[in-house]
Amino acid sequence: MNSISANLNIMIKASEKASKILIRDFGELEKLQVSKKGPKDFVTNADIKAEKIIIDELKKARPNYSIISEENGIEKNKDETNFWIIDPIDGTINFLHGVPHFAISIALQSNNEIICGLIFDPIKDELFYAEKNNGAFFNNQRVRVSKKNKINDCLFVTGGRMKNELDLPYRKSGCAALDMAYVAAGRYDGFFQNELN
């Protein structure tokens, strides 16, 4: 097992705690309250509850750090050089439709640079994380990107529409965070998406 920083450990604990709520709510989809943020952007009470748990856990450990979260926006605190960046459910549409492919993502930005981040799949209990100068890991095992060098042997993933003029093999999964984690772990060979925010 590799050694991880205190900040990454805090993020892992926060994501594990929030995942319990998501798993419970995922099992009771018909009871979820859903509202629309935009034309293709939904928020559930599960998003809000999970985000609150994550923020509470992060603030408990680092009360002065600022926060950028999907549901609450920017919350500047005493320390404006360190920002937690939180998406409590990446893949909300999947979550809403009972598709077990969504994730919690948390990153820490320090002095305008991401220094560590994680993507946690609560359904599969898969944790992907990376830390500056320490590498990328999946459930405590170092990961590497695919070594395929022939484009026709590759499998790509996208979250958006794609003109497939090159006839490339690709998938659309509905969870950009997991798509990128899967590229890091060599499950997919590449990821692209327009208008990712």
Regions found by a protein language model. Give the residues of each.
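Residue-level signal for inorganic ion chemistry
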Residues: 18, 22, 47, 58, ...
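DPxDG-like acidic metal-binding loop motif
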Residues: 78-137
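Generic detector of well-ordered alpha-helical packing
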Residues: 48, 71, 88-91, 95, ...
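N-terminal subdomain of lithium-sensitive/metallo-dependent phosphomonoesterases centered on the IMPase/IPPase/PAP
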Residues: 1-89
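An extended, acidic
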Residues: 144-197
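A structural micro-motif at secondary-structure boundaries
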Residues: 138-142
